[in-house]
C-alpha cells in the first residue's frame, strides 16, 4: 500500500527507510539500483484501471522459493509461456540467479527456518493477492516443500496450486519410509539397511549384501544434514571396503548430525544406468505429464555428488504406465521427481526416492519440448486439461561445459550419440546475459573442470 515501509540496504550496510507505493523490493547493492528496480516493478506490475476507476487484477503471479538452477529454470518457463515476471523469495541469491532480469528477487533472512517461514510467506501472499487473481507458489527444494506442506492450512485460499498432504509426505520424506511405501505397492527398491545413530558402527557387520555399498543420510537435503559439518561430508557415499565406511562414521560421529543412515547394495552400472522421471499431477490427482530422463553424467564434488550434470530425455511407455498407476493410487498432486536405476541383472528399475517438487535438472523436460509450468498454469489458473503427455523426444540438457561430457562420458555408444545434439543450458538464457552475469556464469562453468579433475571416479 501507499504507506509501505521499505528498508534499503546500501552497499556500506547502512539502512535508509522511506515510504513507497511498491510492495516488493529486490536485494539491492545500493540505493540507486533499488530505486531503479522499484520503478521497473511499478511499471511491470501495476494493473490498468478497470471500468469505474478500480484497478483490474492480473491473472496470476508465480512465486518461486529458492535461488538455484531450478529456480532460474522455473522463471524461464513462466517468462517464455506467459511473459510474466515471477517473484523469487530466498535467503540469499546463488550464482544461477544473480544479475538476472527474468524475475524480481526478495531476500528474507532465515526464510527456510520453521519459526520464520509461515508468517513471512503469509505476509507476501496477502500483499500479492491485492493485485493478482491467483498466486502460484513453486518450491525449489525439499525443505521449502516440507514447510509448505506442514503449514498449508495457514495459506489456504491464498495459494491456487495444491501440494500433497503432510500425512502423505510423511510416508516418503526419508528413504527408509519410502522403501516401506515401495514394499506396500509392489515397487522395486535396492536391498537396504537402516542404522540409527547408535548403530552406525555395528551395522556394517550385519549387512545382508556385500561391498561395494552406497551410504546416504535418511534425507541428504534436510537442513539438519546440510548444516552439520564433518571431514569428508557428502550427499552420497560409495565404499569398497569396511574400513572406508568406518572412517567416515568416526568423522560423522564427531558432528552434531543425529539422523539415520541408509546403507544399500550397489546396483551395477555407472551414471548412465540412472533414470529420473518428472511428472505433473493435476488438482484431482490425475497425472497430466511424464518425462523420462537418462543421466549421462553426475556431479562428483562432495556437496553435489549424485546431482545430475547432463541428461538425455527418453521415453518408456511401460515405465510411464506403471509409475502413473503408482502416483494415482497414492493420490499424488503437483510435481514429482523420481530417481531410479536400471538393474541390468533383472531388467527392472529400482526406485531410490520421490522428491515432491521438480529438481535442479528438471529443465531437461523443456529441452524435450515440455513446459511443466505451462501445464500447471493451464490447470490451476485457466482450468484447461488435456490428455496426459508422455514424452518420447530425445534431447540433451547439460549444466556443464561440453568438454567435460566428451572427457568423462565413458561409454563409446553414448558418447557418439551425444555428438548429435546441441545441449540446452538452463542458466544461459538469450536476452538475460549482462556482462556481470555472463562473467559469473563462465567462472561457474570453468570451475567444473577443476571439480571433475579433483573428484571424478568410475563407479564399478
Question: What is each PLM-predicted segment?
Answer:
Residues 169-262, 283:
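Active-site nucleotide/adenylate-binding loops and adjacent lid/helix of ATP-dependent enzymes
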Residues 296-300, 304-308, 355-369:
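Glycine-rich phosphate/pyrophosphate-binding beta-alpha loops
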Residues 327-363:
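Conserved metal-phosphate-binding beta-hairpin within the catalytic cores
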